[in-house]
């Protein structure tokens, strides 16, 4: 069939098709009807009449597609016809129900998009703030520099009719993704957008009111890993279920039918109850996760869908099935579909109506798919046999790939500007311009947007406002989100159980520390500590919400762009699910601690205790979320939150009474959620409680005038709240005198605690609605200063082309690889699934030889990646059976090092540039005998070959932040990292997945050169073009279940391969057909692929298998005697341990230096804490209350170190993931990483400690005149304590494999650090069980003993009048004569000695003696802290060793 005819037929189909976007289910059609193929629903007569017409149209469609099959094998399958019929019936029923058509075309005129130039996007580092500050004093920098810009898109004009499909093709950097984002109305990341985009006549500005009707689906997959496939899809349906459904059709029925349809359509119905999973949680395969992404986007029911490389990770058959489903939905539902593909087959290409080819942001072709190839042929280019049309269209822009026809040399376009000029001068361009003008006039006359607007309003919930962009109402969104959030939590039962188990364990620890507090003066003091500790416990436990907030940002951004729900609804749902979780948590904690504490045994007080703690926990949880939602970086929010927590702890009334607070920070007492919770809990416990002090009253001993004990009438309690003539302290009096709390305010304080919760809810709702920190699927490159390339410059473009051309012509043909023969035999691999074993690989055998390229193919889920993991010795879980040999010998210890493995996941350290990442690999993995200059030269060669020269000084970055190289560029870097190592054997897992055709061609050609030079390699490949496929020598084809279908030669023009299948009864492969697609079709690959032949059984009976086994035996018997190592001594690592350590340490310093958020975040934390603490405890004097303030000052310093643990732990966990990837490839051993990450923290820790010291030490009045040794001791012991905390955080991170486990473990360990340090609970009151070992093994105890004895050793105490405990003196003796205390001193408070004042201490030494501490132990304290620090380093090294291998 002629391509022009095909185009006209599609036009007819579009004009005759239905017009409603919404997927409505015909009444009477059940799930089983779709799955079984039933197509006779029981409906009214008029519907039957329409069925007859539909059947007639279906026959015509079958005839049309059958004809197309004969030409290009892209016809619809039986399932495709069922799908088409389903949509046609749905459309017909929707129209009969009064629905209006939503025919929204796209018209783009003169679209120019301006982006920020990379020359001013310089990599940030620790010097960036200093450089900025210095620039303020340079007049030459005061003039505002004009930001360099470049055109991402340049004057692009095109259109796409409703119901049509537009294919966007272009090499990386052509602007394809930008165009798709602009069509979906995502404009925020660009400097300017000029030109017009109209949606069915609606301007782009007005289109903002219809968010979700044009969606952009990026190539990466973002899903909640603990949700099942069904739950993920059902949630999307709940948010997008239209109001205008069929009569009497319930929402649940509608969702079930649509869910069943889509799951069947994309072949994941068998995985409906499987969790989605991610890189850490086992779930769907990569291909299945991609299908789920596509399914979720389809549920959005958008009028216009933009698909950006959405087939990445799918095999060729599944990609074709996906494209067919888009074609059917476009035809029947009149969806306007725009898609970009990097490697599209002709079968996929022919499904589209028009194609737009971009190069460097310029349009070089826009028109029918059937005329594109001829257009470029007419320009003077030639197309290789079997080369797909899409590959040809993008290849003509690459000087290394294009073929110029004889006689056209020097006449064809060379640069993007040349191509654009040629296109604009063509007759076809003028014809497309005429068609676009006519279409725009037609839109003005017909005004389809009026029906669109009416239908959009009809589909919305009736409770929605007219301006709402959402389908469902706010309450419906909240309900759906509540269910989903509950499913997310329930899906991760391990985390849920771990959380509650941690709470129970810690509650028993807390309860035992403050066990059975008595109603005496010691119980009076410790009750406040116990209640404060209860609040603090829940605060630390809530910090995990900070990490959860950042983790879910990308998913929230994606679903918000689909207009599924308001972000504020998302937060409300979180709040609602918080309530039962927090209630259970607090109740489990309270039921233990309340009664172990010995608090008042009254039901009312117990439930008030629980209710207040619930409010405080809810408020704290939402406070952490608020700081996460308001911050661009996790490190920023963490460090700011540390300062805020210090503030909250200092100003809640526990450590500093209200009347002792200085005015500059005293206001925070009222702006502190902890204040009201603490006041309420203290009032709840103290308001009806009296404390006896008969054994602790003063004066004590014997009256000097009588020789008898002092009469009780003159004795008073030595406590705040004491009153004359009584040996009891009323709790309410104590609250007022000591803390200035009113016990009558309990109810008010509880109410205000919950008001704080509400306030933080509102802040979060506003933050998530109006702030967006994710990149939305795009990346911005940053370069070293002065290293950014020039963009869209014709001369620069020619220069780059010449570099690549030269590199291609000067491929290192003399390169000698030391490859060997690698064989595998009877490979079986099983993994535990529940109580059974699942077989993933079943008797797979084969080999790779020097000089040969072997392709590993099969449908998604066939076990290709699993086989590579097994062969490359990367599997650490499950059971592997079978034999593997290298040169006929068992694999040596150096196998992983000499093997290059390009994995699917592109794991790279974001703090390095591309060149640094490649050089690091070359330095550590090439033989040490190779000079550094040679290694660097080879790196440059690889950069040129892979067209990454211009990216050499670009930061790798991360996709989450949107700063760094793109997805496609990461894949090239992954390959480059392995190639620069000069491996002896190369395994590549989908090296071309996500790459454009030209990059794929370059990579495969480069790999071919490596093979020709003697390297054996095997490569999984999903969607190979005919040209790429012909580079391979052999193929191993797997069926689902890991069974072999074929292993053998491909043959010239694939004849050997295709003849094998033809002999089994498969139709012949045509001359112009892609052999790779042919064999996948023959073996039933794809979503709905079917085959009646049991190919694994056919293979087992084939003579080819017998030949394979004979060859295997021969290869193993004739194995070479040479070792894999040229020196004859296998080494696990190429370089020495000390060289590794030096290189890893240098790299770690670069990474930290380029992470100002982390480094300055820690410093900012120290500055904030130092200023807060210093000015909180401003200029302390020598009164007893000021002495207590000194103790609490040091306690705040203690908390700084503890909070620093959280910050360090996050960084360690991130770096550990990169280490595991490096270790698997034997870059370096576990020891260099462990010791480097410990050493790199030291200077930053010293700076943090010193900053805190200088900000607070003099401010708080702790400087001791003439005691320089004591002043230095304060600094040095604090620095060593911070060393301990940093290494402690590293040890926790080293033993944990993911963040949640670490966040669960940290509070459990921290409780021992601060509870048993000797301040919150004096040593004399610590239970014997804990004191016997935990107290003496607590490093914080030695820090507190050393620093407190140092501060108080020479401190004299002179009580102020307010600090004195007053009692009457009925005698004529002076106060000093009347009562001689054991500690402290007595003084006159009146001139006549009638009233005496007792000061409990007269020196700081007396205080720390009561804690059983001594100043003579200061040296010992430092020594023990150093010992704990060294022990932590030992733990870090040990745990890094034990967890060095990833679980896979």
UniProtKB/Swiss-Prot annotation:
GO terms for cellular component: membrane. Residues 490-717, 1157-1389 form the ABC transmembrane type-2 domain. GO terms for biological process: aggregation involved in sorocarp development; sorocarp morphogenesis. ATP binds at residues 858-865. The keyword Translocase does not apply. Keywords: ATP-binding, Membrane, Nucleotide-binding, Repeat, Transmembrane, Transmembrane helix, Transport. It comes from the Eukaryota. Coiled coil: none annotated. It is found in: Membrane. Belongs to the ABC transporter superfamily. ABCG family. PDR (TC 3.A.1.205) subfamily. This is ABC transporter G family member 9. The gene is abcG9.
């Amino acid at each position: 069939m002629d391509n022009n005819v095909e185009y006209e037929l599609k036009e007819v189909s579009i004009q005759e098709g239905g017009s409603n976007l919404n997927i409505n289910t015909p009444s009477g059609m059940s799930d089983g009807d779709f799955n079984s193929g039933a197509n006779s629903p029981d409906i009214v007569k008029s519907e039957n009449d329409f069925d007859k017409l539909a059947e007639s149209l279906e026959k015509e469609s079958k005839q049309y597609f059958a004809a197309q099959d004969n030409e290009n094998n892209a016809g619809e399958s039986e399932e495709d016809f069922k799908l088409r019929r389903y949509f046609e019936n749905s459309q017909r029923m929707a129209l009969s129900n009064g629905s209006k058509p939503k025919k929204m075309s796209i018209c783009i005129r003169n679209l120019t998009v301006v982006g920020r130039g990379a020359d001013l996007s310089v990599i940030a580092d620790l010097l960036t703030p200093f450089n900025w500050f210095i620039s303020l004093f340079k007049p030459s920098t005061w003039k505002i520099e004009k930001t360099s810009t470049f055109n991402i898109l340049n004057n692009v004009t095109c259109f796409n009719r409703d119901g049509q499909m537009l294919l966007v093709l272009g090499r990386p950097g052509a602007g394809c993704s930008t165009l798709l984002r602009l069509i979906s109305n995502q404009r925020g990341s660009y400097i300017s957008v000029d030109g017009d985009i109209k949606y069915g006549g609606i301007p782009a500005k007005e289109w903002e009111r219809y968010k979700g009707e044009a969606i952009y689906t990026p190539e990466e997959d973002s899903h909640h890993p603990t949700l099942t496939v069904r739950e993920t899809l059902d949630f999307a349906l709940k948010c997008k279920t239209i109001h205008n459904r069929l009569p009497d059709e319930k929402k649940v029925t509608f969702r079930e039918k649509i869910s069943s349809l889509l799951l069947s359509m994309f072949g994941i119905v068998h995985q409906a109850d499987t969790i989605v999973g991610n890189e850490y949680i086992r779930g769907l395969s990569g291909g299945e996760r991609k299908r789920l992404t596509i399914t979720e986007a389809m549920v959005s029911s958008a009028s216009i869908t933009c698909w950006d490389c959405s087939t990445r990770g799918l095999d060729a058959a599944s990609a074709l099935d996906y494209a067919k489903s888009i074609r059917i939905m476009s035809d029947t539902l009149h969806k306007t579909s725009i898609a970009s593909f990097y490697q599209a087959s002709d079968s996929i290409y022919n499904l589209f109506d028009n194609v737009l080819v971009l190069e460097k942001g310029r349009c070089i072709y826009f028109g029918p798919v059937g005329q594109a190839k001829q257009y470029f042929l007419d320009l003077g280019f030639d197309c290789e046999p079997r080369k797909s049309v899409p590959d040809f269209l993008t290849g003509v822009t690459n000087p290394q790939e294009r073929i110029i026809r004889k006689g056209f040399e020097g006449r064809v376009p060379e640069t993007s500007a040349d191509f654009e000029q040629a296109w604009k001068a063509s007759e076809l361009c003028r014809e497309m311009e005429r068609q676009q003008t006519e279409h725009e006039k037609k839109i003005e006359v017909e005004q389809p947007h009026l029906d669109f607007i009416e239908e959009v309003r009809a589909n919305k919930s009736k409770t929605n406002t007219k301006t709402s962009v959402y389908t469902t109402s706010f309450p419906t969104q909240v309900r759906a989100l509540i269910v989903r959030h509950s499913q997310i939590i329930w899906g991760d039962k391990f985390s849920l159980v771990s959380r509650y188990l941690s709470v129970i364990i810690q509650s028993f620890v807390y309860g035992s520390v403050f066990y059975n507090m008595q109603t005496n003066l010691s119980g009076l003091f410790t009750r406040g500590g116990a209640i404060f500790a209860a609040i603090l416990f829940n605060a630390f436990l809530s910090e995990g919400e900070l990490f959860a907030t950042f983790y879910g940002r990308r998913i929230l951004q994606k679903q918000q762009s689909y207009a599924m729900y308001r972000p504020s609804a998302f937060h409300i749902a979180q709040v609602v699910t918080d309530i039962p979780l927090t209630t259970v948590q607090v109740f489990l904690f309270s039921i233990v601690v309340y009664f172990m504490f010995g608090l008042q045994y009254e039901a009312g007080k117990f439930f008030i205790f629980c209710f207040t703690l619930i409010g405080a926990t809810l408020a704290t949880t939402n406070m952490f979320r608020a700081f996460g939602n308001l911050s661009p970086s996790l490190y920023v929010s963490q460090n700011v939150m540390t300062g805020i927590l210090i503030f909250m702890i200092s100003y809640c009334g526990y450590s500093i009474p209200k009347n002792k607070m200085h005015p500059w920070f005293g206001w925070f007492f009222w702006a502190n959620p902890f204040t009201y919770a603490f006041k309420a809990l203290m009032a709840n416990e103290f308001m009806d409680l009296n404390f006896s002090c008969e054994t602790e009253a003063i004066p004590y001993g014997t009256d000097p005038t009588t020789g008898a004990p002092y009469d009780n009438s003159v004795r008073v309690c030595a406590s705040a709240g004491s009153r004359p003539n009584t040996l009891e302290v009323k709790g309410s009096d104590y609250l007022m005198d000591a803390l200035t709390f009113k016990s009558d305010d309990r109810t008010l304080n509880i109410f205000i605690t919950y008001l704080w919760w509400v306030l933080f809810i509102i802040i979060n709702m506003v933050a998530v609605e109006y702030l967006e920190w994710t990149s939305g699927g795009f990346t911005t490159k940053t370069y070293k200063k002065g290293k950014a390339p020039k963009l869209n410059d014709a001369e620069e473009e020619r220069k780059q082309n010449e570099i690549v051309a030269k590199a291609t012509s000067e491929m290192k043909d003399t390169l000698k690889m030391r490859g060997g023969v690698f064989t595998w035999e009877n490979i079986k691999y099983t993994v535990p699934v529940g109580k059974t074993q699942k077989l993933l690989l079943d008797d797979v055998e084969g080999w790779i030889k020097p000089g040969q390229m072997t392709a590993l193919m099969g449908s998604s889920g066939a076990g290709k990646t699993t086989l590579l993991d097994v062969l490359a010795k990367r599997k650490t879980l499950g059971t592997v059976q079978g034999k593997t040999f290298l040169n006929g010998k068992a694999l040596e210890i150096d196998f992983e090092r000499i093997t290059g493995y390009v994995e699917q996941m592109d794991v790279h350290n974001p703090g390095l540039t591309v060149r640094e990442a490649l050089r690091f690999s070359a330095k550590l993995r090439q033989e040490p005998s190779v000079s550094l200059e040679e290694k660097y030269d080879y790196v440059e060669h690889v950069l040129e070959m892979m067209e990454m020269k211009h990216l050499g000084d670009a930061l790798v970055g991360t996709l989450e932040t949107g700063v760094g190289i793109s997805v496609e560029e990461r894949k090239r870097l992954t390959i480059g990292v392995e190639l620069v190592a000069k491996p002896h054997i190369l395994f590549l897992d989908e090296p071309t997945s996500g790459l454009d055709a030209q990059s794929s061609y370059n990579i495969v050609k480069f790999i071919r050169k490596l093979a020709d030079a003697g390297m054996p390699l095997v490569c999984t490949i999903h969607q190979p073009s005919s040209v790429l496929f012909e580079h391979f020598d052999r193929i191993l084809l797997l069926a689902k279940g890991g069974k072999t279908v074929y292993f053998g030669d491909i043959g010239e023009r694939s004849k050997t391969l295709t003849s094998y299948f033809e002999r089994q009864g498969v139709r012949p492969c045509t001359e112009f057909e892609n052999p790779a697609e042919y064999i996948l079709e023959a073996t039933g690959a794809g979503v709905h692929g079917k085959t009646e032949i049991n190919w694994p059984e056919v293979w087992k009976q084939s003579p080819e298998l017998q030949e394979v086994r004979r060859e295997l035996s021969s290869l193993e018997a004739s194995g070479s005697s040479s070792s894999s190592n040229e020196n004859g001594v296998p080494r696990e690592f190429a370089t020495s341990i000390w060289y590794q350590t030096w290189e890893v340490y240098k790299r770690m310093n670069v990474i930290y230096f380029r992470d100002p958020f982390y480094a300055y975040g820690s410093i900012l934390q120290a500055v904030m804490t130092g200023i807060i603490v210093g000015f909180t405890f401003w200029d302390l004097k020598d009164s007893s209350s000021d002495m207590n303030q000194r103790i609490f000052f040091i306690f705040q310093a203690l908390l700084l170190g503890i909070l620093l643990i959280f910050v360090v732990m996050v960084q360690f966990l991130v770096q550990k993931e990169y280490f595991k990837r490096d270790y698997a490839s034997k870059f370096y051993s576990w020891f260099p990483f462990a010791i480097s990450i410990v050493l790199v923290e030291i200077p930053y820790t010293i700076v943090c400690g010193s900053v805190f010291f200088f900000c607070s030490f003099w401010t708080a009045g702790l400087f001791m005149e003439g005691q320089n040794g004591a002043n230095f001791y304060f600094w040095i012991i604090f620095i060593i304590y911070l060393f301990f905390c940093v290494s402690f955080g590293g040890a926790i991170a080293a033993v944990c494999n993911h963040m949640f486990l670490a966040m669960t473990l940290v509070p459990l360990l921290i409780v021992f650090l601060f509870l048993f340090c000797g301040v919150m609970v004096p040593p004399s009151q610590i239970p014997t069980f804990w004191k016997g070992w935990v107290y003496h093994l607590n490093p914080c105890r030695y820090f507190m003993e050393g620093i407190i004895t140092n501060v108080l050793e020479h401190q004299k105490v002179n009580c102020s009048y307010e600090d004195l405990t007053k009692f009457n003196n009925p005698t004529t003796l002076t106060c000093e004569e009347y009562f001689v205390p054991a500690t402290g001193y007595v003084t006159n408070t009146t001139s006549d000695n009638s009233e005496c004042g007792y000061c409990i201490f007269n020196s700081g030494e007396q205080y720390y003696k009561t804690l059983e501490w001594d100043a003579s132990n200061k040296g010992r304290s430092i020594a023990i802290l150093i010992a704990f620090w060294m022990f932590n380093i030992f733990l870090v090294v040990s745990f890094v060793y034990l967890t060095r291998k990833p679980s896979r």
